């Protein structure tokens, strides 16, 4: 069955109406809550190497990846870079907006290309109110994201390079939903 994308009032293609929800946060919402958010979501294709955010710049939109995987990269004063987080189909890029911030301390760069839903930061702020279904799902994701970052830091300190590469490959597989990806 072919999925039709109909133009919205702004002329952008709408998200696929018949397609299953592939982002973990959006999929965890009740169907009525997801349908309420749908007009605020724009389906976009993220390209490998695309910079979504630059460090210390305003976050204008958040992204809910489907197949895409985005790395959060920290750059030290002397120019060295470190991957400090990976976000794929389980999460949201731009979590600082949910946490009350307006900027990101890190650069967000697409590692694996694919689809994502983009939502304006102001729309997310309005939709995340105390006790809302979206707020509850984002809180659960935030707790999980922090645990994954903690595990990643421990792995980088205590494991050999082969083990770290294996963890990274498994993470890419989990977060992209694909066994194949470009390197």
Regions found by a protein language model. Give the residues of each.
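Nucleotide phosphate-binding site architecture
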Residues: 35, 53, 117, 125
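Polybasic "coupling" helices that flank or enter modular domains
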Residues: 112, 128-183
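Cyclic nucleotide-binding regulatory domains
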Residues: 50-113
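A residue-level structural signature of the nucleotidyltransferase/glycosyltransferase Rossmann-like core
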Residues: 18, 26, 62, 84, ...
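Residues that scaffold the ATP/ADP-binding catalytic core of kinase and kinase-like folds
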Residues: 37, 73, 95-96, 127, ...
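Cyclic nucleotide-binding regulatory module and flanking cytosolic helices
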Residues: 2-47, 92, 98, 130
């Amino acid at each position: 069955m072919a999925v039709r994308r109909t133009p919205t009032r702004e002329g952008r293609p709408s998200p696929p109406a018949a397609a299953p929800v592939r982002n973990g946060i959006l999929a965890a919402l009740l169907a009525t809550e997801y349908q309420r958010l749908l007009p605020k979501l724009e389906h976009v294709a993220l390209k490998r190497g695309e910079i979504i955010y630059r460090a210390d710049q305003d976050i204008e939109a958040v992204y809910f990846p489907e197949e895409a995987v985005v790395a959060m990269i920290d750059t030290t004063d002397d120019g060295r870079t470190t991957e400090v987080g990976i976000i794929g189909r389980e999460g949201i890029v731009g979590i600082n907006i949910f946490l009350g911030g307006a900027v990101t301390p890190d650069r967000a760069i697409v590692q694996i290309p694919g689809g994502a839903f983009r939502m304006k930061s102001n729309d997310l702020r309005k939709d995340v109110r105390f006790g809302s279904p979206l707020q509850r799902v984002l809180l659960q994701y935030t707790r999980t994201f922090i645990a994954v970052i903690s595990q990643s830091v421990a792995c980088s300190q205590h494991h050999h390079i082969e083990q770290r590469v294996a963890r990274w490959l498994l993470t890419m597989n989990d977060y992209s939903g694909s066994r194949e990806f470009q390197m």
